[in-house]
């Protein structure tokens, strides 16, 4: 399993590629839908006209040729944690634990391609996540589609993840 994780680290892509992938996802007509649905494995997805904030992350990685559904499932299996192929990759704490395992945490300045984990309403608030774009905005889905309509500081930043260069 360690070999799998190390290999994934080498194949991860660049922050600029992630920013570009996220920007390509702009679609204000994506309907917010957090309901667990059966999806194909590996690399399945709910219908592209539906999604939540985590689906922005998963879809951007998929554009770069990465399957977070499979990677997070395998990561959780390697840790002896319960798994659900339809939903694990669509939960912020699971994404965060996986990104931290790849040494992606960063608490410095923001750059395009950074993955921002917010706490809406303050430090104990609701989880939300998005990807920093070149224009200083963040691609996310908070219920108004997959759009870049917020600045990073609009919400309480909990963690920042950056792909290794």
Predicted feature locations:
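Short regulatory "switch" loops immediately downstream of catalytic or recognition motifs
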Residues: 67, 119, 163
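N-terminal capping segments
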Residues: 5-100
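...with weaker cross-activation on analogous glycine-rich loops/strands in unrelated enzymes
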Residues: 19, 77-146
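N-terminal hydrophobic targeting signals that begin at the initiator methionine
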Residues: 1-2
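Glycine-rich catalytic cores of cysteine/serine-nucleophile enzymes that process amide/ester linkages
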Residues: 32-51, 72-73, 77, 118-159
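Short, low-complexity, Pro/Ser/Thr/Gly-rich segments in the mature regions of secreted, periplasmic
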Residues: 103, 108, 152-165
């Amino acid at each position: 399993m360690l070999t799998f994780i190390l290999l994934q680290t080498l194949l991860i892509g660049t922050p600029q590629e992630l920013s570009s992938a996220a920007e390509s996802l702009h679609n204000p007509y994506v309907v917010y839908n957090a309901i667990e649905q059966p999806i194909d494995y590996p690399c399945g997805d709910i219908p592209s006209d539906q999604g939540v904030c985590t689906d922005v992350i998963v879809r951007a990685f998929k554009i770069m040729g990465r399957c977070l559904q499979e990677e997070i499932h395998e990561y959780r299996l390697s840790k002896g944690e319960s798994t659900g192929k339809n939903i694990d990759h669509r939960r912020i704490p699971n994404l965060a634990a996986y990104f931290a395992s790849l040494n992606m945490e960063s608490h410095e300045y923001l750059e395009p391609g950074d993955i921002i984990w917010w706490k809406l309403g303050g430090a104990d608030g609701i989880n939300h996540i998005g990807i920093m774009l070149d224009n200083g905005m963040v691609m996310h889905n908070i219920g108004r589609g997959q759009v870049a309509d917020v600045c990073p500081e609009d919400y309480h930043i909990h963690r920042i993840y950056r792909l290794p260069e």
